[in-house]
Every structure is written in structure tokens, then in C-alpha cells.
Amino acid sequence: MMHLLRRGAFAILLIVLLPSAALADLRLASWNIQHLGWNVGKDYPAVARIAAQFDFLAIQEVMNAEGIYRLRDTLEDATGAEWSVLYSDALGRNTYREKYAFLWREAAVEYVGGALTYIDEADRFAREPFSAVFRSRGTDQHFLAATVHITYGDRVADRVEEIEALRRYWDWLADVMPEYAGERILFGDFNLPPHHDGWASMRAVAEPLVTEGATTLSTHDRRYANLYDNLWVPKDHTLPLGDAGILPFPVVLSEVTGVYWDHEKARDRVSDHAPVYVLFEGNTLHDAVVAEIADQEAGCIDLNRASVSELTALPHIGEARAEAIKDGRPWNAVRDLKEIRGIGAGRLEEIKARGEACIEP
């Protein structure tokens, strides 16, 4: 069973300024919004600020219908736009169950139909994949969206078993909807990086859109641990794909709100996963977001490798202190900068809060 709900909305506060999606093409994303719907202190306005950067999201780890409705309502109140949601039944092998959801901006995307939960006769998946067909209102481009949350399990082998089963599911999608075979997109949290050997069967017919970076937030600010989230498309796809990447949402929230979001706060209040996205050709992310991504991708200032001039970009670090940092190498942790004359507790906290200084492995 699937559930589709749509409602009207009115504007209260614009949190982002995006071009009219109906006049451009789409921004598609996949996001594991950790335990969406549980009473765990989720900051729905913050989640909505990130979700509003896109026109369509495939969401994993939806714990109940109330959670996805609340996110939709927050998006509508914040953007003044109408958003719709389609979600699966609760899926799982035991008392722990999750839903999948598709969430989209009505001005940009139309639900075409064909919502299906995979009939997993071999019981290979703990949570069977969910799919539906959509189209861009601006260009009439159709796409068959499918989403899955691969089990983490007790061993990597548990994940590999499900990853290998994706090939049969991928072929099944083409069999049941052959008219959309070239327009399939598999959104998900796969709990396995795309270069792992377990993907061999899928790699024969499909390709990941994100191959560099990482999507899971580490406990260290501005550091990401694993590339688990991704989007897969057919090798012979007919989709108008543009840029794809990872949205480092703690950086974006820090910029948009004016309040620093460290990884501890981001993991507790939003998610321990960053969204991955793909843009259809002719589209871009919001300019401020693009700038922040560029800053993030530019990398941090490594205390053990940066030049004196690069070190002076850090707060409270002039040429003399930069020379002292260079002379004090190797550094084991950013907190050790307190050994530099003139860097007291307050200045050290500001350096750490900016998230620009690091110790690269």
C-alpha cells in the first residue's frame, strides 16, 4: 500500500530564494533523515531549510506518517509552496520498521503513478525497495524513482547480500515498466561505498552518480566518514543529468542561520547523513549553497602542511603565529594550538568553531 497526500499552503517566511522550478529543470536528492518522526528533538525548520534546496527528495528512515507530514507542513509554511508526499507501508523483518517517502514541490514535479513496493519472494531485503513514476512539469521529462535503505547488519556480508540482490530488483523495474527503463534512478542509503566489490553485478548495467567524498557525519566537525548514500542510473540512461554531489548541510545551516552548527548538533537535531543530489541539465543549486559547497570542497587548513600565508587565513593567526605553528610541527590536534603564545581559551574556541583548521591523516 502507498499513501499520497497533498494540501494547499500559504507563505509565512521564505527560507530560501530559488528560481521558479516550473521554468527550470529539477533538483533531485536522496536523504536518510535519521529517525524522522521519532520524538528525538528533531529540528524540523532546520530539516526543511535543507529539503527546500531541492524539488524532489527520496527519503529513507521515515519512522511514521506523522514525521513526513510534519516535514511537509513545515516546508509549506516556510516556502509558501505546495508540497506533496507519497510513502510506503512500514517495512522490516521485526518490530523495528521504517517507511520510504517521496517528497516533492508541486510546482515542479507531478506524480504520474505506478507506486510499487517490491515483492521480494526470496526475502533478500530487510526493507523492500519502493518506487513510483514522476515527471518534470517544466520539461515533461519523466523519471522512475526507486529508493532503498540497505540493512547495516552485523557484518559487511549482510549488506553485500542485499546489494547483490539489487541487480534482480533493477532488472525487475525495467521489466514491469519498460517504457521507463532508461529513466530509472535508484536513490538510497546503501551502507556500502560504490567502489566495493559487492557492487560488481550492478556496475555491469548501472553507474553511481557520486564517487568522491563521504556522506555520513563523523563526530569531528567538517569531517565525513563514509560514502554510503548515492544515486544510481542505467549506463544507457536517457536522463538529462547535470552536476551531482553531496550537500554538507551543517555548513549550509551555519551560513543560513548565522549560528554555528557543529556535527554533534547536526547529528542530534537533523541527521547523521548528508543528502546526495543530482541536477537535471540547466539547473543549479541556490547560489549561497553553491558557495558554501565550494568552501567545503576546498578543504581545511592542515596545521602540518599549510604554508605560512595559508595559516594566516585562520582567525587570530598573523604571520608571527603562523611561523610558530610551522615551527611547532607536527601537531596532533587543533586544541594543541593553545601552546602558541597569545592563543588563549577564547581564541582557541573561535578557531575550532570556524571549522577551518584540521589535522589531515
From Swiss-Prot:
Matching SMART domains: DNaseIc (SM00476), HhH1 (SM00278)
Keyword Flavoprotein annotated: no
EC number(s) reported in the record: 3.1.-.-
Cofactor note: Requires Ca(2+) or Mg(2+) for catalytic activity and the maximum activity is achieved when both of these ion species are present.
One Gene Ontology cellular component annotation held by this UniProt entry: extracellular region
MF (Gene Ontology): DNA binding; DNA nuclease activity
Active site residues of this protein: H149
Entry keyword set: Calcium, DNA-binding, Hydrolase, Magnesium, Nuclease, Plasmid, Secreted, Signal
Keyword Transmembrane helix: no
Pfam families: Exo_endo_phos, HHH_3
CDD domains: MnuA_DNase1-like
Entry-linked InterPro entries: DNase_I, Endo/exonu/phosph_ase_sf, Endo/exonuclease/phosphatase, Hlx-hairpin-Hlx_DNA-bd_motif, RuvA_2-like
Its job: DNA nuclease able to digest short and long DNA substrate. Is resistant to ionic strength and thus active at high salt concentration.
Note: Thioalkalivibrio sp. K90mix is adapted to extreme salt concentrations and grows at salinities up to 4 M of NaCl.
Family: Belongs to the DNase I family.
Protein name, as recorded: Deoxyribonuclease
Organism annotation: Thioalkalivibrio sp. (strain K90mix)
Lineage, broadest ranks: Bacteria, Pseudomonadati, Pseudomonadota, Gammaproteobacteria, Chromatiales
